């Protein structure tokens, strides 16, 4: 998985910041063991923080999540159906978002028509722990994963808060 930039609140911090996030999987293994945050805001510019997941906790890695998406009967059937209709299914970049002592994975699916039109967002896939969902919007996909009711329209969105312990090095 390639590193990517995001805005999030790091564990122990009071405000969000712009970071470069890199998830880590062990050599020849597929599970996730840690993630690294490279801070980009002052006064912490250039500082690196490594967050290890607890040793006894299994956190799925990107390859495991991709395999689970491919093996999901409903998702696989939909992708096959869209591909046969003369369109191309484009899988967007898989994002790993730290939440508590685990990861939320988010991957958009785009559909590009044969006639060269710009791809349109068709579905959003989310995965957390053993749960996986594919819905028309991110909000609906998150509701499938976490349950609950939709947020009120006037409610301001709240960023995810990562919770993990920095590694002692």
Model-identified regions with their sequence ranges:
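Accessory, solvent-exposed terminal regions and/or long lumenal/extracellular loops of proteins
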Residues: 1-169
């Amino acid at each position: 998985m390639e590193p990517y930039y995001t805005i999030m609140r790091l564990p122990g911090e009071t405000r969000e910041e712009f970071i470069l996030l890199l998830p880590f999987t062990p050599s020849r293994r597929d599970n996730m063991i840690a993630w690294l945050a490279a801070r980009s805001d002052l006064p912490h510019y250039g500082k690196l923080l490594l967050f290890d997941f607890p040793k006894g906790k299994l956190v799925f890695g990107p390859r495991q999540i991709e395999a689970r998406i491919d093996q999901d009967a409903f998702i696989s059937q939909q992708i096959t159906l869209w591909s046969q209709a003369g369109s191309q299914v484009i899988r967007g970049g898989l994002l790993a978002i730290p939440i508590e002592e685990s990861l939320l994975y988010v991957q958009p699916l785009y559909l590009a028509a044969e006639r060269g039109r710009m791809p349109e967002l068709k579905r959003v896939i989310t995965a957390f722990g053993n749960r996986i969902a594919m819905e028309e919007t991110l909000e609906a996909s998150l509701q499938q994963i976490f349950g609950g009711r939709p947020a009120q329209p006037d409610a301001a969105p709240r960023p995810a808060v990562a919770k993990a312990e920095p590694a002692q090095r």
